[in-house]
Amino acid sequence: MPENRMSRLSNQYHDWARSHPTAAVDFRTAIEDLLNDAGIIFDRVSTRVKTWPSLKAKAKKRGENGDFVYPQPWDEIHDVMGVRVTLYHSTAIPEALDVFGESFKVERSVDKAAETRISGGFGYGSHHLVLTVTEDSAAAMEELAAYVGWTFEVQIRTVLQHAWAEFEHDIRYKQGPNPPSPEVDRLFTCLLYTSDAADE
């Protein structure tokens, strides 16, 4: 029953949150140290634990066939712990990907910018990783000792990509019921080309 499913998810989420009250700080500290030790210069590492209302809304999503997108939400939603790494230049992204690949088990790696280009659209660049903390991860990063087996999501962006994403979200897509005009779309497309060139 859907109610039992959501009740179970609520118990799982709140039990985990109570057991790991410093999760956001633990992951931020561990990843900052990881990048520093690897010699990667970064702007910032930000972390957040997904709120219960946000998790509940995601767990209720259904596909076109009416089935739940996440039948087992606690096991299938991987951004309860979310990490964002902001780098100064795009050339550092492959280095960061290598460091994460060596330090965690990589469940999924997606280049969002490449996906957008392949589909013929436009959008900000961002690389998304789904990672799992292993015994080796915890041995190297003592802050993560309590999270062995835990899966989390990492977004890697440059400072420019991050600024673009925030700007586009606030100006282009938060327009209420009125869609942006063709002039606005053309302006954003031109700005995107300019920002891509600058990031290279």
How should these model regions be labeled?
Residues 101-108, 175:
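A common structural junction motif
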Residues 46-51, 110-128:
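Short, glycine/charge-rich beta-strand/loop segments that flank catalytic centers
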Residues 119-168:
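Internal, well-ordered alpha/beta segment that forms a basic, Gly-enriched binding/recognition surface
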Residues 61-71, 105-116, 127, 133-141:
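Short acidic (Asp/Glu) patches
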Residues 150-159, 165-192:
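Flexible glycine-rich active-site/ligand-binding loops centered on an Asp-His dyad
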Residues 1-80, 87, 91:
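Charge-rich, low-complexity segments
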Residues 92-97:
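Short, conserved charged micro-motifs
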